[in-house]
């Protein structure tokens, strides 16, 4: 029983740590919003270098927030596994008592007592299956985030768009992401229609 108490204390400590990580994540989210506002003000003043620094800070805070959340999630998964282990230990003890009761029922030939014992036996097995399934579905894993130049530019452009500011000058656009104009779309559509007509004519 002492081991079970120790395990429950560990579970409590891990849950507390997970909550602390979630609080840190919320703090980073708040700081990210603050940095974005600084990006806006810097853009309004034409201070693009300052805006870039604030954008980098915002992205770094977002990265920290995600890392805190991932670590919290992994701790929750560990807690789930330990919680299952603690419950399984309790169930194992119950199973031992049930087996003893079953042996006693078999010895005395008490069918009613044997039936009641088997009901308890089956119920414990169902509990074990449910706990095992929950443990198998526990979350785990972590990935890392980077803050490339393109992401900084993207965040600055996003803030500018949100507040209706002009910042396209001096912000390099990522290759391969140009938005086609209506005229370009119309030309492509007409060209496709023409080629389909030619194919039908050949057929």
Curated annotation (Swiss-Prot):
Record keywords: Autophagy, Coiled coil, Cytoplasm, Endosome, Membrane, Protein transport, Transport
Protein transport as UniProt keyword: yes
First and last residue of the signal peptide: none
Ranges in coiled-coil conformation: 13-51, 109-140
Location in the cell: Cytoplasm; Endosome membrane
Pfam family, any one: Snf7
Membrane topology: Peripheral membrane protein
Phenotype upon loss of function: No visible phenotype under normal growth conditions, but double mutants chmp1a and chmp1b show embryo development defect.
GO cellular component, one term: endosome membrane
Amino-acid biosynthesis keyword on record: no
GO biological processes: autophagy; embryo development ending in seed dormancy; embryonic axis specification; endosome transport via multivesicular body sorting pathway; protein transport; seedling development; vacuolar transport
Domain of life: Eukaryota
Role this protein plays: Involved in ESCRT-dependent multivesicular body (MVB) formation and sorting of endosomal cargo proteins into MVBs. Mediates the MVB sorting of the auxin carriers PIN1, PIN2 and AUX1. Required for embryonic axis establishment and seedling growth. Required for autophagic degradation of plastid proteins. Promotes the efficient sequestration of cargo from plastids into autophagosomes. Mediates the efficient delivery of autophagic plastid bodies to the vacuole, but not into the cytoplasm.
UniProt-listed PANTHER family: CHARGED MULTIVESICULAR BODY PROTEIN
Family designation: Belongs to the SNF7 family.
Subunit structure: Interacts with SKD1/VPS4 and LIP5. Interacts with CHMP1B. Interacts with VPS2.2.
Name used for this protein in its record: ESCRT-related protein CHMP1A
Gene source species: Arabidopsis thaliana
Taxonomic lineage of the native organism: Eukaryota, Viridiplantae, Streptophyta, Embryophyta, Tracheophyta
